[in-house]
């Protein structure tokens, strides 16, 4: 029997969308957008083949432990999800997420991609890592995660790309690469 790994991870992403819908009563398809943007960005850096496939999977599953974290942090009180942007220790879901994917059958080394996907270029992220200490995959997912949050559909306006470009210019060197 042959395992369709991409199909499996697509199904996992769908399951995460369902959990998101249950928690915050809306499905945003955030993981799918981040995965798509991550693949497009990684290709510009010359990433291809199995490494690109593994990055796509990591991007799909980058927030795989977010609901687990919320459940543990708030003892199952899903109404706490409303305060998500203000959670002080959101990096904990990165640790849980890294553990969750550790036994998955990746083709390449994906260690620390999930763990460091909220790190900032200047070391101000949850683990204090600077850009040179963070795998390229995690840096790409960080950038695409920020862009998706910035350009999400509920705040979409015709000038969204100009605002996104201005945002990236403001945070260059602090949050993302120069």
Regions found by a protein language model. Give the residues of each.
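Histidine- and acidic-residue-rich, metal-dependent catalytic cores
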Residues: 2-178
């Amino acid at each position: 029997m042959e395992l369709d790994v991409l199909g499996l991870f697509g199904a996992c992403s769908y399951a995460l969308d369902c959990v998101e819908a249950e928690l915050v009563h809306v499905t945003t398809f955030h993981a799918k957008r981040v995965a798509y943007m991550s693949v497009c960005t990684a290709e510009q850096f010359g990433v291809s083949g199995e490494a690109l496939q593994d990055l796509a999977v990591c991007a799909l599953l980058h927030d795989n432990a977010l609901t687990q974290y919320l459940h543990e942090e708030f003892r199952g009180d899903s109404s706490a999800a409303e305060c998500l942007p203000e959670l002080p220790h959101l990096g904990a879901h990165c640790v849980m997420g890294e553990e969750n994917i550790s036994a998955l059958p990746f083709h390449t080394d994906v260690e620390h991609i999930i763990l460091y996907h909220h790190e900032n270029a200047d070391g101000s992220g949850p683990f204090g890592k600077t850009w040179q200490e963070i795998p390229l995959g995690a840096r790409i997912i960080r950038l695409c995660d920020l862009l998706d949050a910035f350009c999400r559909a509920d705040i979409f306006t015709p000038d969204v790309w100009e605002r996104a470009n201005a945002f990236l210019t403001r945070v260059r060197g602090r949050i993302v690469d120069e």
